[in-house]
Amino acid sequence: MLSFKFAKSASKVIGNRNFHSSSASLANTTKLFINGKFVESKTKEWLEVRNPATQELVTKVPVSTKEEMEAAVKAASDAFPAWRDTSVSNRSRIISNYKNLINKNMDKIAAIITEEQGKTLPDAKGDVFRGLEVVEHSVNVASLMMGETVENVSKNVDIYSYVQPLGVCAGITPFNFPAMIPLWMFPLAIACGNTFVLKPSERVPSASMFLVQLAQEAGVPDGVVNVIHGGKEAVNFICDAPEVRAISFVGADQAGRHIHARGTANGKRVQSNMAAKNHATIVPDAHKERTLDALTGAAFGASGQRCMALSAAVFVGESKNWIPELAERAKKLKVAGGAAPGADLGPVISAASKQRIHELIQSGIDEGAKCILDGRNVVVDPEFSKGNFVGPTILTDVKPHMRCYKEEIFGPVLVCLNVDTVDQAIQLINANPYGNGTAVFTSSGAVARKYQREIDVGQVGINLPIPVPLPFFSFTGSRGSFVGAGHFYGKTGVQFFTQIKTITSNWRDDDISHGVSSSMNMPILGKN
């Protein structure tokens, strides 16, 4: 049952949630998903999930016991041989069924996201849709799992390769995209023939639970996808479990580097997408209205809690004169609960996050920046008076040494820097340690081409503020924003979840009717 008052209509849409307990003693708690069953945890430690717009309790998440985590990994390990041997065509049909169920239930998933994460309903639907795109691409995974063949490398000798699944894989997901990031991970992994253990963010568990419920309805066999809950203990268990072959992670810097170090030390593949400081470069010849609209949406949408949010704007030359108009646009944005009519920004995830954002805003002011739009005391409707709200905030005259520039704020705060030339903008951005995304706004093809060639950032938008690639490409954040063995989804995503087996085959013509003699010499292929 949905707990927040302003979305009572959404509770009628969602209906029964198998993943929430109906037991009187475990009322309002979230289950585990192990070997095809939603299981009540035997833990004595629970974490509260509260609606960030109202502070009302939504559910309690178990800190999975060691025995429960071991059971999840065992279920995945036991299910792997049969799932690996399921034909790629049948796996694709199941993923296609899953795609259809996600599409059918998009409104329900979005309502769950808004309740637990806080983002507006339209933004929550976008969260689901961007994940759905990866599921759609996973349906056609067979075309990316084709091996290679060279015939007759030597007389009667052929070499060919197979692309095969790894085994048990795991995913650790963040709070900011409760549907999209899990859907980046386990659908592609299982489409490739792997089995999976998912640990969703303990702050937003229910979207992941509903997604695995739909996967079961789509025909995913028992044990192929499993869900555990918890914090650091669950993360370390995944990093250490010998059965787990690969780990996908999206989240904060410290956690990402810990998972990469611990996982790789245990012989696992790890892909770790971490923090960002995404810059927009505004050239004076850009289309002014479109640029300001793009900056407003990309800086303040989702309350700045996107790993690809534009959190820094670099104004070249006279384009700095556009900043007052940008502030006027930001002032008009409505801050409210995510399901409230007309809401543009919802709350940030927690009171601690709100406090940190406030501190970073103040640090900028203390270090000499000007706060031309201050969202720290934003006024919201009385029903949201307890929520974690921060309004759009703009700091100008920011310098690279300031804390508000150096750190990822992860809130609706845009820091503005001024430079004289595009070259200076490129130098400034390349000096920043992060490399997730950037955008340039210009009407000059020459400037755009120079920017895309010289900028040391993994994803570049040209007159497009949030350049997240569609899934037939890959999400290619770089430098301080990524460590690991391969990027998410696309070709590199398939490569991450698979391994290559190469076969050298020797079927000699004379073996048909004659005996075979032994040779003690080193075999040399290609000589004959």
UniProtKB/Swiss-Prot annotation:
Gene Ontology CC: mitochondrion
Positions that bind NAD(+): 175, 199, 202-203, 408
PROSITE patterns: ALDEHYDE_DEHYDR_CYS
Transit peptide, from-to: 1-26
Organism lineage: Eukaryota, Amoebozoa, Evosea, Eumycetozoa, Dictyostelia
NCBIfam families named among the record's database cross-references: MMSDH (TIGR01722)
GO BP terms, alphabetized: thymine catabolic process; valine catabolic process
Catalysed transformations (reactions): 2-methyl-3-oxopropanoate + NAD(+) + CoA + H2O = propanoyl-CoA + hydrogencarbonate + NADH + H(+); 3-oxopropanoate + NAD(+) + CoA + H2O = hydrogencarbonate + acetyl-CoA + NADH + H(+)
SUBUNIT field: Homotetramer.
Active site: 307
Keywords per UniProt: Mitochondrion, NAD, Oxidoreductase, Transit peptide
Role of this protein: Probable malonate and methylmalonate semialdehyde dehydrogenase involved in the catabolism of valine, thymine, and compounds catabolized by way of beta-alanine, including uracil and cytidine.
PANTHER family per record: MALONATE-SEMIALDEHYDE DEHYDROGENASE, METHYLMALONATE-SEMIALDEHYDE DEHYDROGENASE [ACYLATING], MITOCHONDRIAL
Protein name as it appears in the record: Probable methylmalonate-semialdehyde/malonate-semialdehyde dehydrogenase [acylating], mitochondrial
UniProt keyword Hydrolase present: no
Molecular function, one GO term: malonate-semialdehyde dehydrogenase (acetylating) activity
SUPFAM superfamilies documented for this protein: ALDH-like
EC number: 1.2.1.27
A Pfam family it matches: Aldedh
InterPro entries according to UniProt: Ald_DH/histidinol_DH, Ald_DH_C, Ald_DH_CS_CYS, Ald_DH_N, Aldehyde_DH_dom, MeMal-semiAld_DH
Family, per entry: Belongs to the aldehyde dehydrogenase family.
